[in-house]
Amino acid sequence: MSNISRQAYADMFGPTVGDKVRLADTELWIEVEDDLTTYGEEVKFGGGKVIRDGMGQGQMLAADCVDLVLTNALIVDHWGIVKADIGVKDGRIFAIGKAGNPDIQPNVTIPIGAATEVIAAEGKIVTAGGIDTHIHWICPQQAEEALVSGVTTMVGGGTGPAAGTHATTCTPGPWYISRMLQAADSLPVNIGLLGKGNVSQPDALREQVAAGVIGLKIHEDWGATPAAIDCALTVADEMDIQVALHSDTLNESGFVEDTLAAIGGRTIHTFHTEGAGGGHAPDIITACAHPNILPSSTNPTLPYTLNTIDEHLDMLMVCHHLDPDIAEDVAFAESRIRRETIAAEDVLHDLGAFSLTSSDSQAMGRVGEVVLRTWQVAHRMKVQRGALAEETGDNDNFRVKRYIAKYTINPALTHGIAHEVGSIEVGKLADLVVWSPAFFGVKPATVIKGGMIAIAPMGDINASIPTPQPVHYRPMFGALGSARHHCRLTFLSQAAADNGVAERLNLRSAIAVVKGCRTVQKADMVHNSLQPNITVDTQTYEVRVDGELITSEPADVLPMAQRYFLF
């Protein structure tokens, strides 16, 4: 039997079981847990390579082979870190395993034929497309910015650069909901809209759900009262949608205990649960201890750095229509920004007590940095806190699974879309992000949307090869024309689907219905289900978890930062 060195094998086919890969310039290392390809039968495309007629490519018709295969990919997902080929058919994941020609090769689960395209993923990492559940639809250009960061699904609300949308993620009322669904029909990402949940009588909420929203947003700027919270959750239970909450910073209509009483044990997604983005001051962070609370962070406080506190005051004044010349407005802003709770937030993520990350796009958050900042937190916690107790080897595999779940499977579960997106699993939409390890989490090599390349770095269009400078991210065919409608999903409530909203609005994109929004619990948050006892000292703002003081040091240097953005 012929032998090949590990290094030569990795150079040719990518890493295999036992090999380790560094993620970007962080201190995070992953180790390959399993290899679903077959040694000696690996497929690879190119001159003199395997995927040729009668060799790795068979004679079957299109119906019997995949449309796309990603060869020798290193999959990083909540369920594992595995080397495999990934087959895609009709825009969905067909199989994860061994690609090739079943007529002459063993163990083939992904048949390659004349109808099959190849993306070479040797030496590359492949992740599921990210999901950002805190989108202020201030401008449509956010979709492309999100896409080039590896986010393929955007959930939120708004109508454009209006004062209401600058501050809140609400698309209010049937007319705006209809117009936003029509506008978003041409965006190259999956979308779901949130309606305005701030009313105390149910009919105004029911009509928004019937018009097409997949959730209701309760925001303090519209009045986050116990009555509004109870009403929104009552309608949500009735119509199987999610409720997202930005609670009452000023404690005007009650304290965190009153809000929890109004929630009454029902499932709810609490936005920026640390509090700098808004919520009961100073102790909204304690909500994440409850079994029905699905807590998320927005990215301006992630990770905690020397600049975090100074940056926040001006951001808050702009986004929430506050006047720096009014003392009460300044006091309101300052009450939300607490060094101690921000310092605790990173640790709560590392413990798995906070379950999701998101952006708060153009409204105190950066739409293109959800993925990047999530991994910066993971790096900071590795450096400050060392290996997690759950790790089973000399690697960071468990920590990596915990953090990737925060922007993939957990937001999908939270908003009832996990049957369609959120992980690399058979049957789900083929929203896949391909990364070179050195650029992991920062700049994707390719973003695949519904089985087609939607955006990718591309060199000089007049060059003789695709790689000469200047290289820019450019929309690809999966984001153009009517092809995009076959490669994306518009999420609707069951009531909207039954109401014929897609047909009435002439939506051309595929429609998917949210489900299971009311039964999901904190315990269902993958790798992020911890429910500790959390207390906040109302005088010092110190945070304690099960009696232990929780804090972290502000970062003065971060990975995945300036060195990646010089050009």
UniProtKB/Swiss-Prot annotation:
Binding site for substrate: H219
Subunit composition and interactions: Heterotrimer of UreA (gamma), UreB (beta) and UreC (alpha) subunits. Three heterotrimers associate to form the active enzyme.
Top-level EC class as recorded in UniProt: hydrolase
GO MF annotation list: nickel cation binding; urease activity
Location in or out of the cell: Cytoplasm
Cofactor: Ni cation
Domain Urease as annotated: residue spans: 129-567
Gene Ontology BP term (one): urea catabolic process
Name under which the protein is recorded: Urease subunit alpha
Residues with N6-carboxylysine modification: K217
Species in which this protein is naturally found: Klebsiella pneumoniae (strain 342)
Catalysis performed (reactions): urea + 2 H2O + H(+) = hydrogencarbonate + 2 NH4(+)
Cofactor binding, note field: Binds 2 nickel ions per subunit.
Highest taxon of the lineage: Bacteria
Presence of keyword ATP-binding: no
Binding residues for Ni(2+) 1: H134, H136, K217, D360
Pathway recorded for this protein: Nitrogen metabolism; urea degradation; CO(2) and NH(3) from urea (urease route): step 1/1
Alphabetized InterPro entries for the sequence: Amidohydro-rel, Metal-dep_hydrolase_composite, Metal_Hydrolase, Urease_alpha_N_dom, Urease_alpha_subunit, Urease_AS, Urease_asu, Urease_asu_c
Family: Belongs to the metallo-dependent hydrolases superfamily. Urease alpha subunit family.
PTM section of the record: Carboxylation allows a single lysine to coordinate two nickel ions.
Active site: H320
